[in-house]
Amino acid sequence: MRFILTITAFVAFLSGCTETVSRDGPARILAMGDSMLAVHGASGNSVSHAVEQALGEDVIDRSVMGAKYFYALPISGSAGLNIRKQYVEGKWDWVVLNGGGNDIWMGCGCGRCDNRVDRLISKDGRRGTIPGFVSELREKGSQVILLGYLRTPGVISPIEGCRDEGDEMDRRMSRLAQLDRGVHFLSLADVVPHGDRSYHTVDLIHPSAKGSTEIGKRVAEVIRRTEAKTR
């Protein structure tokens, strides 16, 4: 009984970390992913909050700390730890999507990760979990912004060993975006100046409020620039 109550409380906590939305709601931008998007949500300083401020419109943020693409547990996965299950039906013009970092860091320790990366996305960007999910989103009529990986400032960090995998994932997601004009890859490789710790929290993994704001501004610019071309 205690175990069941613990699981129930955990799922309730995860559910409370994501925004709910009505299908008839006014928001047209949906954000999904892991802690890079979810961090600072409670304080109003997340990436999505920065997008809202830049564009002057609502963003529904369904991202969850620790979320992965490969997540087998059904209950907590449905609560958002499985990125694909963060999706909610709606008239989304835009979906902002990140993820895969936890699958690499926690799944293979940024060591022998070739197979894990291939399962996420193939070298040509055409196959894998990420292209499959992006294809589903495109079929629903949404344009997709794929966020690249936030680099460390070049100092000792728990994820410093993941740099090669992050670079390779960026290359593959860029190729995916080249296949479809409705998919936009946003590289974050130049967000953090070398040696500048101010774009990260003290763990040197997650973006600080400053880092989240910068990412959000860049997301908003992609939306603004793309929509200006269609007017």
Regions found by a protein language model. Give the residues of each.
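Active-site segments of SGNH/GDSL-like serine hydrolases
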Residues: N98-N102, F133-G166
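Alpha-helical scaffold elements within enzyme catalytic domains, especially in hydrolases
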Residues: A50, E136, R175-L176
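N-terminal secretory targeting modules
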Residues: M1-M32, M36-S43, H49-Q53, K85-K91, ...
